[in-house]
Amino acid sequence: MDEFFRAIAAESKLPESIARQLTDAGYVVIEGPVAHNKCEQLAKAYDAAVLAAHPDDVRISSSTRISDFVNRGPDFDELYIYGPLLAACCQIIARPFRLSTMHARTLEPGTPVESLHVDFKREDDGWPMVGFIVMVDEFRSDNGATRFVPGSHLATNVPGDVMEDATAEYDGEVMAGGPAGSIIIYNGSVWHGWTANRSAKPRRSIQGAFIRREQQSGVNLKARMRPETLSRIGGLAKYLLDVE
């Protein structure tokens, strides 16, 4: 067990109520890490980064996804080093971990509901992933807020095993809404998916995932790292990006 992980585990502690919800429900919504008076600045930085992205980094399907928000500017540097997020990784992954990916996702008006799914199945020796979603816009029931099935991370099956139509409403599902600047932290094995955006405006978010340190990341962050990013981030960020 490396020294950085021990330090993170020692310094990052969740309130009991949040730790319990992660254990029991598999997800939690926290009003942070972006302060209310910084949300407009974050939204402007998001839009500018999306417009400046190289076409190779843009993937358009039922939503628009822009990869590698680690290297999109200083407005995003604090998101993946947020203390409660790292504490959740210590609780769920429970071993040295690193960032696998951090990207933007926009649900345009009319985007249909996403199928319930898991990001990673639970492995025999525990849970391999923690996901997070930072709300650039308010998440509401009409604009594509993410739905979760509480406790489903404890199941041995996945939605496709038990649902004929994984886009259908599932008994007991809960909408994870919140004001702009909030963060959803979730166990990668919990059933989840975005809902339909029935509003007249896009719904924007920044999403990412932490994985076990020895696993292969979704994006080769070391190869993509820009000098200006390396020059401004600290030791904790470099450790989490595995570029120290």
Segments and roles (model prediction):
Residues 173, 180, 201-205:
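Active-site lining segments that contact anionic ligands and/or coordinate catalytic metals
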Residues 178-192:
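Conserved metal-binding segment of the jelly-roll/cupin
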Residues 29-30, 132, 184-186:
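Short hydrophobic-aromatic micro-motifs
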Residues 1-25, 30-118, 122-123:
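Non-heme Fe(II)-dependent double-stranded beta-helix
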Residues 2-8, 52, 190, 195-244:
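Non-heme Fe(II)/2-oxoglutarate
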Residues 110-177, 215-223:
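Catalytic core of non-heme Fe(II) oxygenases with the double-stranded beta-helix
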Residues 102-104, 132-134, 206-210:
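A structural signal for short, well-ordered beta-strand segments
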Residues 73-76, 170-172, 194-195:
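Active-site rim elements
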